[in-house]
Amino acid sequence: HLYFNDLRKFGWIKVLDEDGLEQEVSKLGPEIEWPEFTFEYFVKALHSKARTKVKTVLMEQSLIAGIGNIYSDETLFKAKVLPTRLVKDLSEGELRSIYDSISPVLELAIEHGGTSLKDYRRLDGGQGDYLHFANVYHRASQPCKVCKTTIERTVVNGRSAHFCPNCQR
């Protein structure tokens, strides 16, 4: 049996031979645990899209594989950077903070089985409970867990972006 549950309608299934698979994988940037995902690579990748909002660049799979909407919001919250900032306006310290925030956010998400929205399930049928640990994602109009300021939601490149206007600059 093959089951494909694509709640958000972003997924696809392709049947590929080895060459086709290699072509598809070659379109992806490195995953964060790969040795080539260094701070230097990260800065170069982001600067290649300098006039783009940082949230959009973090979700660009050809630059960095594996960061989607939820984890870009959470990474930027941890780094204290607004999702609407242009890459060209970020300091080296802010870039370092974003880079250093990616792994802990994704590790926590993996530890909690990811995020289950509506009817999404893991392969074992269970639900991921990361959303209970999220600081900003899906928390618009609720108080920030850090400062109690109301979490806001905006749209960045067609995707929702959640942030704390006090904690993030």
Each language-model region and where it sits:
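Short functional micro-motifs and their immediate structural scaffolds
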Residues: 72, 151-152
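Short, flexible, mixed-charge glycine/proline-rich loop motifs
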Residues: 131-140, 154-157
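Phosphate/anion-contacting hairpin/loop surfaces
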Residues: 1-66, 71-78, 86
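Short cysteine-rich clusters marking metal-coordination/redox-active sites
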Residues: 144-147, 164-167
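Basic, amphipathic alpha-helical segments enriched in Lys/Arg and hydrophobic/aromatic residues
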Residues: 94-111
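RNA substrate-recognition surfaces in RNA-acting enzymes
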Residues: 80-89, 95
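Residues immediately within or flanking Cys/His clusters that coordinate Zn2+
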Residues: 61, 138-141, 161
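Short Cys/His-rich Zn2+-coordinating modules
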Residues: 102-104, 121-132, 145-149
